[in-house]
C-alpha cells in the first residue's frame, strides 16, 4: 500500500505537494516579458531607426516632435505611458507577472513567502491597477493612430503598393486591436451592472457588443501574447529596414 501525504507542508516559498514541473509555467513568462521589457526600453531610448519610407515603428507612433523643437529626448518616451500602462494594468498580465516576477503565488497549490498585513491591490502602488479601465480608452486612441500608420504603409511615394513591411504593420495593428477589444473593461462597459439588456437604453446594441466582446475576451490571453510578439517584431522589422540590414521586399 502506498502512503499518500494528507497534510500540507509548512507554508513557505515553493512548498508544495505537486510533483510536476510547476515552475515551467512561469519560466517562459519571465523570459518573454523580461526580454521584451529590455528590448523595448533600449529601443525607446535609442531614438533612431524608427521610420523608413511609409513605415513607422509602433514604438514611436504617434510620432511627436521628431525634430526636438521642445522635447530633447526620444519621441517614444512621450507616448510610452499609454501602451505600457494598458498592458501593465491588464487583468491577464497582472496574473502573469505577479506569479512570474513576484512569486505571489508562484503557481496553484505552491506556497509563497509568509507575510503580515497582506493588502493586495488596496494599497499603493498596486491600488493604481484600478485605473485599467481608463487606460483602455487611451489604448483605443493609440489603436486609431496605428491603423492610420497601417493604411499609410500602403502608399509608396504617393502610389498604392504593398511591401513586406505593409503586411507586418497591418498584422500587428490587427492583433493589437483584438487584444484591446477583448479587454475585460469593454465587456463590463457593454454589459456590466445589467440584469436585463432589453430593459436598458440601447439594449440591443449593448447586447451585441457584449456578445462579441465576450467571444474575444475568452481568447484574451492568446491575443495578449500574439500582440506582444507582433508589436516587438514590427518595431524590429522597421529598425532593420531603416538601418539597411534588411531590404524591404515589394510585393505589389
Report residues per predicted region.
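Membrane-embedded alpha-helical bundles that constitute the cytochrome b-like, heme-associated redox core
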Residues: 1-252
Amino acid at each position: 500500500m502506498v502512503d499518500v501525504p494528507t497534510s500540507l507542508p509548512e507554508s513557505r516559498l515553493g512548498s508544495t505537494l505537486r510533483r510536476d514541473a510547476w515552475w515551467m509555467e512561469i519560466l517562459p513568462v519571465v523570459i518573454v516579458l523580461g526580454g521584451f521589457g529590455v528590448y523595448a526600453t533600449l529601443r525607446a531610448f535609442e531614438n533612431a531607426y524608427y521610420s523608413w519610407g511609409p513605415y513607422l515603428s509602433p514604438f514611436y507612433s504617434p510620432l511627436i516632435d521628431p525634430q526636438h523643437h521642445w522635447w530633447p529626448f526620444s519621441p517614444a518616451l512621450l507616448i510610452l505611458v499609454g501602451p505600457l500602462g494598458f498592458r501593465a494594468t491588464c487583468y491577464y498580465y497582472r496574473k502573469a507577472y505577479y506569479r512570474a516576477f513576484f512569486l505571489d503565488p508562484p503557481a496553484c497549490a505552491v506556497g509563497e513567502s509568509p507575510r503580515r498585513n497582506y493588502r493586495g491591490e488596496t494599497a499603493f502602488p498596486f491600488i493604481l491597477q484600478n485605473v485599467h479601465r481608463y487606460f483602455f480608452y487611451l489604448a483605443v486612441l493609440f489603436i486609431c493612430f496605428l491603423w492610420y500608420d497601417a493604411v499609410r504603409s500602403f502608399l509608396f511615394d504617393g502610389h498604392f503598393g504593398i511591401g513586406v513591411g505593409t503586411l507586418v504593420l497591418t498584422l500587428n495593428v490587427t492583433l493589437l486591436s483584438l487584444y484591446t477589444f477583448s479587454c475585460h473593461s469593454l465587456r463590463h462597459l457593454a454589459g456590466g451592472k445589467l440584469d436585463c439588456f432589453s430593459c436598458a437604453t440601447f439594449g440591443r446594441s449593448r447586447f451585441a457588443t457584449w456578445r462579441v466582446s465576450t467571444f474575444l475576451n475568452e481568447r484574451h490571453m492568446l491575443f495578449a501574447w500574439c500582440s506582444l510578439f507582433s508589436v516587438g517584431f514590427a518595431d524590429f522589422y522597421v529598425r532593420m529596414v531603416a538601418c539597411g540590414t534588411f531590404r524591404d521586399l515589394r510585393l505589389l
